[in-house]
Protein backbone atom coordinates (compact mmCIF):
# COMPACT_ATOMS: atom_id res chain seq x y z
CA UNK A 1 0.00 0.00 0.00
CA UNK A 2 1.39 3.42 -0.92
CA UNK A 3 2.34 6.02 1.65
CA UNK A 4 -0.12 8.46 0.04
CA UNK A 5 -3.06 6.07 0.56
CA UNK A 6 -2.09 5.59 4.21
CA UNK A 7 -1.91 9.36 4.67
CA UNK A 8 -5.30 9.84 3.01
CA UNK A 9 -6.76 7.38 5.48
CA UNK A 10 -5.22 9.42 8.31
CA UNK A 11 -7.02 12.52 7.03
CA UNK A 12 -10.28 10.58 6.71
CA UNK A 13 -9.95 9.27 10.25
CA UNK A 14 -9.40 12.80 11.56
CA UNK A 15 -12.52 14.02 9.75
CA UNK A 16 -14.58 11.08 11.02
CA UNK A 17 -13.41 11.71 14.59
CA UNK A 18 -14.46 15.35 14.26
CA UNK A 19 -17.88 14.44 12.92
CA UNK A 20 -18.44 12.01 15.76
CA UNK A 21 -17.70 14.76 18.27
CA UNK A 22 -20.04 17.32 16.74
CA UNK A 23 -22.32 19.04 16.62
CA UNK A 24 -23.72 17.99 19.99
CA UNK A 25 -22.48 16.48 23.22
CA UNK A 26 -24.31 14.34 25.78
CA UNK A 27 -26.52 16.29 28.21
CA UNK A 28 -24.35 15.31 31.15
CA UNK A 29 -21.31 16.88 29.52
CA UNK A 30 -23.00 20.08 28.35
CA UNK A 31 -22.31 23.20 30.39
CA UNK A 32 -24.58 26.08 31.38
CA UNK A 33 -23.94 29.72 32.22
CA UNK A 34 -25.55 31.74 35.01
CA UNK A 35 -26.03 35.47 34.40
CA UNK A 36 -27.18 37.70 37.25
CA UNK A 37 -29.73 40.33 36.21
CA UNK A 38 -30.87 41.94 39.48
CA UNK A 39 -29.25 41.99 42.92
CA UNK A 40 -29.94 43.68 46.23
CA UNK A 41 -26.24 44.26 46.95
CA UNK A 42 -23.47 44.62 44.37
CA UNK A 43 -20.80 43.73 46.93
CA UNK A 44 -22.40 40.31 47.45
CA UNK A 45 -23.59 39.46 43.93
CA UNK A 46 -22.79 41.75 41.02
CA UNK A 47 -25.57 42.40 38.49
CA UNK A 48 -26.57 45.16 36.04
CA UNK A 49 -29.42 46.35 38.30
CA UNK A 50 -29.55 46.95 42.04
CA UNK A 51 -32.92 46.67 43.77
CA UNK A 52 -32.87 47.13 47.56
CA UNK A 53 -36.43 45.72 47.68
CA UNK A 54 -35.18 42.31 46.56
CA UNK A 55 -34.44 40.29 49.70
CA UNK A 56 -34.69 36.50 49.54
CA UNK A 57 -36.18 36.45 46.05
CA UNK A 58 -38.57 33.48 46.03
CA UNK A 59 -41.56 32.74 43.80
CA UNK A 60 -41.58 33.94 40.18
CA UNK A 61 -44.44 34.11 37.68
CA UNK A 62 -45.65 35.93 34.56
CA UNK A 63 -48.55 36.00 32.15
CA UNK A 64 -48.10 35.20 28.45
CA UNK A 65 -46.43 38.55 27.78
CA UNK A 66 -46.00 40.36 31.10
CA UNK A 67 -42.80 41.24 32.95
CA UNK A 68 -41.57 38.85 35.62
CA UNK A 69 -43.22 39.11 39.02
CA UNK A 70 -40.84 38.14 41.82
CA UNK A 71 -41.69 37.56 45.48
CA UNK A 72 -39.40 39.40 47.90
CA UNK A 73 -39.79 37.33 51.05
CA UNK A 74 -37.62 39.62 53.14
CA UNK A 75 -38.95 42.83 51.64
CA UNK A 76 -42.65 42.10 52.01
CA UNK A 77 -43.34 43.02 48.39
CA UNK A 78 -43.69 41.61 44.91
CA UNK A 79 -41.38 43.35 42.44
CA UNK A 80 -41.55 43.39 38.64
CA UNK A 81 -38.78 43.26 36.05
CA UNK A 82 -38.93 43.49 32.26
CA UNK A 83 -36.34 41.35 30.44
CA UNK A 84 -35.62 41.78 26.72
CA UNK A 85 -36.02 38.32 25.11
CA UNK A 86 -33.11 38.93 22.72
CA UNK A 87 -30.51 40.68 24.85
CA UNK A 88 -31.58 39.91 28.47
CA UNK A 89 -31.33 43.66 29.14
CA UNK A 90 -33.40 44.12 32.29
CA UNK A 91 -35.34 47.12 33.58
CA UNK A 92 -37.68 47.82 36.46
CA UNK A 93 -41.29 46.84 35.81
CA UNK A 94 -44.36 49.01 36.25
CA UNK A 95 -45.23 48.31 39.89
CA UNK A 96 -44.04 47.21 43.33
CA UNK A 97 -46.86 45.59 45.29
CA UNK A 98 -47.02 45.43 49.09
CA UNK A 99 -48.09 42.03 50.43
CA UNK A 100 -50.52 42.06 53.42
CA UNK A 101 -50.01 40.30 56.74
CA UNK A 102 -46.43 39.79 57.85
CA UNK A 103 -45.36 40.17 54.22
CA UNK A 104 -43.34 36.94 54.20
CA UNK A 105 -44.41 36.13 50.65
CA UNK A 106 -43.14 32.90 49.09
CA UNK A 107 -44.90 31.36 46.11
CA UNK A 108 -47.00 33.16 43.55
CA UNK A 109 -48.92 32.39 40.37
CA UNK A 110 -50.66 34.13 37.48
CA UNK A 111 -54.46 33.78 37.53
CA UNK A 112 -55.17 32.46 34.04
CA UNK A 113 -58.89 32.19 34.86
CA UNK A 114 -59.22 35.98 34.72
CA UNK A 115 -62.23 37.81 36.11
CA UNK A 116 -64.19 34.61 36.81
CA UNK A 117 -62.06 33.64 39.82
CA UNK A 118 -60.43 35.15 42.90
CA UNK A 119 -62.08 38.57 42.47
CA UNK A 120 -60.37 38.92 39.11
CA UNK A 121 -56.97 39.28 40.76
CA UNK A 122 -54.27 38.84 38.12
CA UNK A 123 -51.57 37.50 40.46
CA UNK A 124 -52.01 35.40 43.60
CA UNK A 125 -49.56 35.08 46.50
CA UNK A 126 -49.04 32.87 49.56
CA UNK A 127 -46.97 33.70 52.63
CA UNK A 128 -45.24 31.94 55.50
CA UNK A 129 -47.66 33.50 58.00
CA UNK A 130 -50.57 31.73 56.28
CA UNK A 131 -51.84 34.75 54.36
CA UNK A 132 -53.20 34.29 50.84
CA UNK A 133 -53.45 37.50 48.83
CA UNK A 134 -54.16 38.74 45.33
CA UNK A 135 -53.53 41.77 43.14
CA UNK A 136 -55.24 43.38 40.16
CA UNK A 137 -54.57 46.74 38.58
CA UNK A 138 -57.45 48.49 40.37
CA UNK A 139 -55.79 47.80 43.74
CA UNK A 140 -52.81 50.06 43.00
CA UNK A 141 -49.72 49.14 44.97
CA UNK A 142 -51.21 46.90 47.69
CA UNK A 143 -52.51 43.35 47.35
CA UNK A 144 -55.80 42.37 48.97
CA UNK A 145 -56.19 39.65 51.58
CA UNK A 146 -58.04 36.54 50.40
CA UNK A 147 -57.27 34.45 53.49
CA UNK A 148 -56.04 35.84 56.80
CA UNK A 149 -52.90 34.65 58.55
CA UNK A 150 -52.95 31.62 60.85
CA UNK A 151 -50.32 29.86 62.95
CA UNK A 152 -51.64 26.58 61.57
CA UNK A 153 -50.47 27.44 58.07
CA UNK A 154 -46.97 28.01 56.70
CA UNK A 155 -47.25 28.37 52.95
CA UNK A 156 -44.08 27.81 50.92
CA UNK A 157 -45.39 27.57 47.36
CA UNK A 158 -48.50 27.83 45.21
CA UNK A 159 -49.95 27.19 41.76
CA UNK A 160 -53.26 27.48 39.91
CA UNK A 161 -55.00 24.42 38.49
CA UNK A 162 -57.98 24.48 36.13
CA UNK A 163 -60.36 21.52 36.10
CA UNK A 164 -64.04 21.12 35.28
CA UNK A 165 -64.24 24.75 34.17
CA UNK A 166 -63.19 26.08 37.58
CA UNK A 167 -59.97 27.49 39.03
CA UNK A 168 -58.37 26.24 42.24
CA UNK A 169 -55.40 27.68 44.10
CA UNK A 170 -53.14 24.98 45.53
CA UNK A 171 -50.91 25.99 48.44
CA UNK A 172 -48.08 23.92 49.91
CA UNK A 173 -48.71 24.02 53.66
CA UNK A 174 -45.36 23.04 55.16
CA UNK A 175 -46.54 23.10 58.77
CA UNK A 176 -49.70 21.07 58.27
CA UNK A 177 -48.08 18.73 55.75
CA UNK A 178 -50.85 19.24 53.22
CA UNK A 179 -51.77 20.80 49.90
CA UNK A 180 -54.47 23.30 50.82
CA UNK A 181 -57.08 23.99 48.14
CA UNK A 182 -58.86 27.32 47.74
CA UNK A 183 -61.72 27.57 45.25
CA UNK A 184 -61.72 30.41 42.77
CA UNK A 185 -65.50 30.85 42.86
CA UNK A 186 -68.36 29.82 45.13
CA UNK A 187 -69.85 27.36 42.63
CA UNK A 188 -66.70 25.26 42.26
CA UNK A 189 -67.17 21.68 43.51
CA UNK A 190 -64.73 19.93 45.80
CA UNK A 191 -61.86 18.13 44.13
CA UNK A 192 -62.03 14.34 44.05
CA UNK A 193 -58.83 13.73 46.04
CA UNK A 194 -56.39 15.52 48.33
CA UNK A 195 -52.88 15.40 46.80
CA UNK A 196 -51.48 12.82 49.21
CA UNK A 197 -48.45 10.65 48.45
CA UNK A 198 -49.35 7.42 50.29
CA UNK A 199 -45.72 6.36 50.64
CA UNK A 200 -44.24 9.61 51.91
CA UNK A 201 -42.04 9.05 55.00
CA UNK A 202 -42.93 10.73 58.27
CA UNK A 203 -41.38 14.15 58.78
CA UNK A 204 -41.65 15.27 55.17
CA UNK A 205 -44.11 17.93 54.02
CA UNK A 206 -45.08 19.72 50.78
CA UNK A 207 -42.45 22.37 50.02
CA UNK A 208 -43.70 23.54 46.63
CA UNK A 209 -46.42 22.75 44.11
CA UNK A 210 -46.54 23.51 40.38
CA UNK A 211 -48.76 22.65 37.41
CA UNK A 212 -46.53 21.63 34.50
CA UNK A 213 -47.48 19.83 31.32
CA UNK A 214 -50.96 18.95 32.57
CA UNK A 215 -49.75 17.38 35.81
CA UNK A 216 -49.47 18.71 39.35
CA UNK A 217 -45.97 18.21 40.78
CA UNK A 218 -45.31 18.46 44.51
CA UNK A 219 -41.86 18.67 46.07
CA UNK A 220 -41.31 17.50 49.64
CA UNK A 221 -38.66 18.60 52.13
CA UNK A 222 -37.80 17.44 55.64
CA UNK A 223 -39.39 19.59 58.35
CA UNK A 224 -37.39 21.18 61.14
CA UNK A 225 -38.57 20.79 64.74
CA UNK A 226 -40.90 23.81 64.50
CA UNK A 227 -42.29 22.66 61.16
CA UNK A 228 -41.58 26.10 59.77
CA UNK A 229 -38.40 25.63 57.75
CA UNK A 230 -36.75 22.77 55.92
CA UNK A 231 -33.90 20.67 57.30
CA UNK A 232 -31.52 20.47 54.33
CA UNK A 233 -29.25 17.54 53.65
CA UNK A 234 -28.19 15.11 50.95
CA UNK A 235 -31.12 12.88 50.02
CA UNK A 236 -33.64 15.04 51.86
CA UNK A 237 -36.41 15.25 49.30
CA UNK A 238 -39.07 13.69 47.12
CA UNK A 239 -41.09 14.76 44.07
CA UNK A 240 -44.50 13.28 43.29
CA UNK A 241 -47.06 13.78 40.52
CA UNK A 242 -50.85 14.10 40.69
CA UNK A 243 -53.69 14.79 38.30
CA UNK A 244 -55.75 17.98 38.47
CA UNK A 245 -58.27 16.34 40.81
CA UNK A 246 -55.59 15.48 43.36
CA UNK A 247 -55.22 11.78 42.55
CA UNK A 248 -51.74 10.35 43.11
CA UNK A 249 -50.06 9.33 39.84
CA UNK A 250 -46.71 8.23 41.19
CA UNK A 251 -43.31 9.23 42.49
CA UNK A 252 -41.04 11.10 40.06
CA UNK A 253 -37.96 11.42 42.26
CA UNK A 254 -36.88 9.80 45.52
CA UNK A 255 -34.02 11.15 47.66
CA UNK A 256 -30.70 10.59 45.85
CA UNK A 257 -29.39 14.01 44.76
CA UNK A 258 -32.43 15.84 46.10
CA UNK A 259 -31.76 18.35 48.87
CA UNK A 260 -34.82 20.37 49.93
CA UNK A 261 -36.16 20.58 46.34
CA UNK A 262 -38.30 23.62 45.50
CA UNK A 263 -37.81 24.92 41.96
CA UNK A 264 -39.73 23.13 39.20
CA UNK A 265 -39.79 23.68 35.43
CA UNK A 266 -40.11 21.76 32.18
CA UNK A 267 -36.99 22.29 30.07
CA UNK A 268 -37.78 24.33 26.93
CA UNK A 269 -37.26 22.80 23.48
CA UNK A 270 -33.92 24.50 22.88
CA UNK A 271 -32.61 24.42 26.45
CA UNK A 272 -29.59 22.22 25.87
CA UNK A 273 -29.09 19.52 23.28
CA UNK A 274 -31.41 16.81 24.61
CA UNK A 275 -33.19 18.15 27.69
CA UNK A 276 -36.41 19.27 25.97
CA UNK A 277 -39.45 18.18 27.97
CA UNK A 278 -37.45 16.91 30.94
CA UNK A 279 -38.33 17.97 34.48
CA UNK A 280 -35.87 20.37 36.10
CA UNK A 281 -35.85 20.22 39.91
CA UNK A 282 -33.86 22.86 41.77
CA UNK A 283 -32.46 22.15 45.24
CA UNK A 284 -32.76 24.94 47.77
CA UNK A 285 -30.47 22.93 50.04
CA UNK A 286 -27.36 22.95 47.85
CA UNK A 287 -28.30 25.08 44.83
CA UNK A 288 -27.93 22.32 42.24
CA UNK A 289 -30.44 21.54 39.48
CA UNK A 290 -31.51 17.94 38.88
CA UNK A 291 -32.99 16.52 35.68
CA UNK A 292 -35.67 13.82 35.75
CA UNK A 293 -38.09 12.17 33.39
CA UNK A 294 -41.44 13.92 34.03
CA UNK A 295 -43.45 10.70 33.68
CA UNK A 296 -44.31 9.09 37.03
CA UNK A 297 -44.97 5.81 35.20
CA UNK A 298 -41.30 5.57 34.26
CA UNK A 299 -39.30 7.66 36.74
CA UNK A 300 -35.66 8.20 35.85
CA UNK A 301 -32.84 10.40 37.11
CA UNK A 302 -31.04 11.92 34.11
CA UNK A 303 -28.28 13.89 35.82
CA UNK A 304 -27.60 17.45 36.95
CA UNK A 305 -26.96 20.66 35.02
CA UNK A 306 -23.22 21.22 34.73
CA UNK A 307 -21.32 24.48 35.10
CA UNK A 308 -18.39 25.58 32.98
CA UNK A 309 -15.90 24.02 35.40
CA UNK A 310 -17.24 20.52 34.82
CA UNK A 311 -18.91 20.37 38.24
CA UNK A 312 -22.65 20.58 38.90
CA UNK A 313 -24.03 24.09 38.52
CA UNK A 314 -24.95 25.56 41.90
CA UNK A 315 -26.72 28.77 42.89
CA UNK A 316 -26.65 29.75 46.55
CA UNK A 317 -30.18 29.88 47.98
CA UNK A 318 -31.84 28.74 44.75
CA UNK A 319 -35.62 29.02 44.67
CA UNK A 320 -37.66 29.36 41.46
CA UNK A 321 -36.97 28.05 37.95
CA UNK A 322 -39.17 29.61 35.24
CA UNK A 323 -38.91 29.71 31.42
CA UNK A 324 -39.37 33.09 29.75
CA UNK A 325 -42.43 34.11 27.70
CA UNK A 326 -40.83 35.82 24.64
CA UNK A 327 -42.50 39.05 25.70
CA UNK A 328 -41.50 41.28 28.59
CA UNK A 329 -40.54 38.14 30.47
CA UNK A 330 -37.39 37.11 28.61
CA UNK A 331 -36.60 34.38 26.11
CA UNK A 332 -38.67 31.21 26.27
CA UNK A 333 -35.55 29.14 25.53
CA UNK A 334 -33.92 30.24 28.78
CA UNK A 335 -34.62 29.38 32.41
CA UNK A 336 -34.84 32.32 34.81
CA UNK A 337 -34.18 31.86 38.51
CA UNK A 338 -34.61 33.53 41.88
CA UNK A 339 -32.47 33.01 44.95
CA UNK A 340 -31.93 34.06 48.55
CA UNK A 341 -28.14 33.83 48.89
CA UNK A 342 -26.25 34.36 52.12
CA UNK A 343 -28.72 32.46 54.28
CA UNK A 344 -31.73 34.20 52.66
CA UNK A 345 -30.36 37.61 53.68
CA UNK A 346 -29.90 38.80 50.08
CA UNK A 347 -31.79 38.59 46.81
CA UNK A 348 -30.87 37.57 43.28
CA UNK A 349 -32.71 37.23 39.98
CA UNK A 350 -31.00 35.92 36.87
CA UNK A 351 -30.97 33.61 33.87
CA UNK A 352 -29.53 30.18 33.05
CA UNK A 353 -28.64 29.31 29.46
CA UNK A 354 -26.58 26.61 27.74
CA UNK A 355 -23.06 27.56 26.69
CA UNK A 356 -23.05 27.78 22.85
CA UNK A 357 -21.28 24.85 21.26
CA UNK A 358 -18.67 25.32 18.51
CA UNK A 359 -20.21 25.41 15.05
CA UNK A 360 -20.00 22.19 13.05
CA UNK A 361 -18.06 24.01 10.37
CA UNK A 362 -15.36 24.99 12.82
CA UNK A 363 -15.09 21.42 14.03
CA UNK A 364 -14.75 20.19 10.45
CA UNK A 365 -12.12 22.83 9.75
CA UNK A 366 -10.24 21.68 12.84
CA UNK A 367 -10.34 18.09 11.62
CA UNK A 368 -9.21 19.05 8.12
CA UNK A 369 -6.39 21.15 9.52
CA UNK A 370 -5.26 18.32 11.77
CA UNK A 371 -5.26 15.90 8.87
CA UNK A 372 -3.46 18.34 6.55
CA UNK A 373 -0.73 19.02 9.08
CA UNK A 374 -0.30 15.28 9.61
CA UNK A 375 -0.05 14.80 5.85
CA UNK A 376 2.61 17.53 5.50
CA UNK A 377 4.70 16.07 8.30
CA UNK A 378 4.46 12.53 6.88
CA UNK A 379 5.39 13.73 3.38
CA UNK A 380 8.43 15.55 4.74
CA UNK A 381 9.51 12.43 6.57
CA UNK A 382 9.08 10.36 3.37
CA UNK A 383 11.16 12.76 1.25
Residue ranges and their predicted role:
Residues 22-24, 28, 361:
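Residue-identity detector for glycine
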Residues 28-354:
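Sequence/structural signature of beta-propeller domains
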Residues 11-23:
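Bacterial N-terminal signal peptides
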Amino acid sequence: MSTLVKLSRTVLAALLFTLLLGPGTPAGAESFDVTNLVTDDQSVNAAPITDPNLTNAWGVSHSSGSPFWVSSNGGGVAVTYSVNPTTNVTSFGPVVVTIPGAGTVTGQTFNSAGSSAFNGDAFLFVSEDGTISGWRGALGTTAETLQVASNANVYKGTTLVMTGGHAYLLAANFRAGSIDVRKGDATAPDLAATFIDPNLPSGYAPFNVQVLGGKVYVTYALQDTLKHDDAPGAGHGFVSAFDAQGNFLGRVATQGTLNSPWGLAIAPASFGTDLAGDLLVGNFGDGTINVFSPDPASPKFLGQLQGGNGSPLDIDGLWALVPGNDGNGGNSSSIFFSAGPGGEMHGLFGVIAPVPEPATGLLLLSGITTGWLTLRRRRRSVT
